[in-house]
Amino acid sequence: EVRRFAKYILVNLNSHSSLIIHLGMSGRLKFYLKKNYQKEKHDHIVIEFDKFYIVFNDPRRFGMFFKLNNKELISFFSNYGLDLLVDKINISNVLEKFKKKSISLKQALLDQSIFVGLGNIYANEALFHCRLSPLRSTNSLNREDILKLIKSCRHVLKLSLKNGGSSINDYKSPDGTLGSFQSMFHVYQKTEVILKKRSFIVKKIIQNGRSTFFSPTLQK
């Protein structure tokens, strides 16, 4: 069985252990029939099966590939939050958690102890979709804001999955095809020059060491 949790791929090896894979910034899994495989640069792990290989390729080496037993697996994910695409979200609980914090909304979306699976690209796009500013403090949000936020996060994630993800630099699917969600970005890595024909301008700032793209006029 192969499943996903947060940004991890989990492969059940048997009833008591799993393989944990994180693609990092540039990692990808590749599948080859044995007769077709030729080792490429940055092929760090090769798993052999009867008729094919699964290869983990990672140029920038930010990925992870390791094995855990069931007890270790529970402990490893114990501090992770809710999965926006799988778990039922209790709006009241999220609102209460946000009211106790005074961090920026963008920072909260990247905090994997609150929600899992959102990276920088999708946090930027989701906030634009619901027209909420990344600079807003979490304790300033009301119930309606939370509802809009959750809906937008789910929308952006589902749309990205439908379009094969975002292939900006290195990402490819296991069959080698590129994702196309990057062509649908509204704000991420968009410059003022690109957006001159639009009715809004995108501003870039740095929050907690990460690039944030947003429209100051549309996102409040």
Where do the PLM segments sit?
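Basic, nucleic-acid-binding surfaces and adjacent catalytic neighborhoods in DNA/RNA-processing proteins
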Residues: 10, 97-220
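Phosphate/anion-contacting hairpin/loop surfaces
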Residues: 19-117, 122-129, 137, 144
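A cross-family signal for N-terminal binding/gating loops and helix N-caps
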Residues: 1-65, 159, 187-197, 203-204, ...
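Short low-complexity stretches enriched in small and charged residues
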Residues: 4-5, 12-14, 80-82, 169-172
